[in-house]
A protein has these predicted regions:
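Active-site pocket-lining segment
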Residues: 180-183, 216-219, 229, 300-369
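Short, well-ordered amphipathic alpha-helical segments that serve as non-catalytic structural scaffolds
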Residues: 26-42, 65-69, 94, 178-185, ...
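Conserved catalytic cysteine-centered active-site region
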Residues: 55-110, 120, 173-176, 245-272, ...
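N-terminal extracellular/periplasmic Venus flytrap/periplasmic-binding protein-like
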Residues: 11-12, 23-32, 40, 156-162, ...
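Conserved beta-ketoacyl condensing-enzyme motif
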Residues: 22-110, 114-142, 220-236, 310-311, ...
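Flexible glycine-/small-residue-enriched beta->alpha junction loops
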Residues: 109-184
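Condensing-enzyme catalytic core mediating Claisen C-C bond formation in acyl metabolism
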Residues: 1-24, 151-168, 248-314, 318, ...
Length: 405
């Protein structure tokens, strides 16, 4: 099979929910990173055969948003385009699937990444289509329902590996939001609230430090936002989800978000609901050599795996095990690691089961501090990993994350 290399990697700054990017159109957001990835690669867009981007919640007026973004970015209409949904893993899946096409000789160049505009996810009235008749109907928050990841249709938390305890009894046979999966992992591993908050604090503090010291400057694509008439455009180029100066005392004051009294998962030790996009140009090593391009990195191997939905946050455990089996690497061989913090408790569960060294993991913050624009995060952590490796002079890194469902 052909060797696959990355020749450019970039991302937008991550917007807070209802923050600076609130009124940004998703297709426009995606086009910004696509255009910049092409520019940084130094290629003619006509050589791009396929554009593959992750997205979990496309706007109804722009299905296959990837295609629209690609055309806006100047990618020729002859290129294919696909929008990939593997929930939180979507952005990484877009890269992996593009890599597979290249490895097997289907084409040589792909533009891959992910995008999400969670501020733009709407409310819906499911019963309105066929008539509400003489009764009130409810506006459904599509974000909240999405965060239940199918458990309204397929409940059964008690069928997972954790079969007893108060949490299981409360949700037996009922749908459950993703925060409950983090509570179950905390229960499984006996993780304390203080341990969870410590990971969240590190994430926020690392994100703040990296921002202040300019560690993200090379990876972030500035976004120019028009203002009211007569005012200069606003430049959005810094992540805005993290809380500056956050302390353990601040986190300790927050109440449980999903289970009263006994819960350990809070808004402060969970990932954010965010807006953002990330992109990279990948190609065969032969094509890069032909074009005289210096790759940013090589994609050496991929692993994957799944687990019961009730502990979905532990899915990096079998995925990493699969990767190690395929490569004969040891976890200690990786000089830097990105493991997305969907929840701080979930991160700790993975850290313990995989045997991660926290000192080299999520060194510039992760989901808790930076935020989690779901369709983009899989690619975002790859982008951030590559830039952190370059800055620190490292040569072998690993990026992994969980996905609900």
């Amino acid at each position: 099979m052909k060797e696959v290399v990355i020749v450019s990697a970039c991302r937008t700054a991550i917007g807070a929910f209802g923050g600076t990017l609130r009124d940004m159109n998703l297709a426009t957001l995606g086009s910004i990173v696509m255009k910049e990835a092409i520019k940084r690669a130094g290629i003619d867009p006509t050589i791009i055969a396929d554009v593959r981007f992750g997205c979990c919640r496309e706007p109804v007026d722009s299905l296959n948003t990837t295609r629209i973004s690609a055309l806006m970015a100047g990618v020729p209409e002859t290129a294919m385009a696909a929008t990939i949904n593997r929930v939180c893993i979507s952005g990484m899946e877009a890269v992996i699937s593009g890599m597979a096409y290249i490895q097997n000789g289907f084409y040589d160049v792909a533009l891959c990444g992910g995008m999400e505009h969670m501020s733009g996810i709407t409310y819906s009235v499911p019963t309105a289509r066929w008539g509400c008749r003489f009764q009130d109907q409810v506006f459904v928050d599509d974000i909240v329902h999405a965060l239940h990841a199918g458990s309204h249709i397929l409940p059964g938390l008690e069928q997972g590996p954790i079969k007893e305890g108060e949490i299981v009894e409360r949700f037996r046979g009922k749908p459950y939001i993703m925060g409950i999966t983090a509570e179950l992992i905390a229960y499984k591993h006996g993780i304390t609230r203080e341990e969870i908050d410590a990971v969240a604090l590190r994430s926020h503090n690392n994100a703040e430090r990296a921002t202040v010291e300019g560690d993200f400057k090379e990876e972030i694509v500035p976004i120019e936002l028009p203002q009211k008439k007569g005012k200069p455009p606003k430049i959005f180029d810094k992540d805005e989800h993290f809380r500056p100066g956050l302390t353990m005392d601040d986190l300790a004051k927050l109440p449980p978000a999903f289970i009263g009294k006994i819960g350990k998962v809070t808004a402060g030790n969970s990932s954010g609901v965010n807006d953002g996009a990330a992109a990279m140009v990948i190609m065969s090593a032969d094509k890069a050599k032909e074009l005289g391009l210096k790759p940013v990195a090589r994609i050496k191997a991929v692993g994957g795996g799944g687990c019961h939905p009730s502990v979905m946050g532990l899915s990096p455990v079998p995925a990493v095990a699969d990767l190690l089996k395929r490569t004969n690497y040891k976890i200690s061989d990786f000089e830097l690691v990105e493991l997305n913090e969907a929840f701080a408790a979930q991160y700790i569960g993975c850290e313990r089961e995989i045997g991660l060294n926290r000192e080299v993991t999520n060194v510039n913050g992760s989901g808790c501090g930076l935020g989690h624009p779901v369709g983009a995060t899989g690619c975002r952590i790859m982008v951030s990993l590559l830039h952190a490796m370059k800055k620190r002079g490292k040569t072998l890194g690993m990026a992994t994350l969980c996905g609900g469902g």
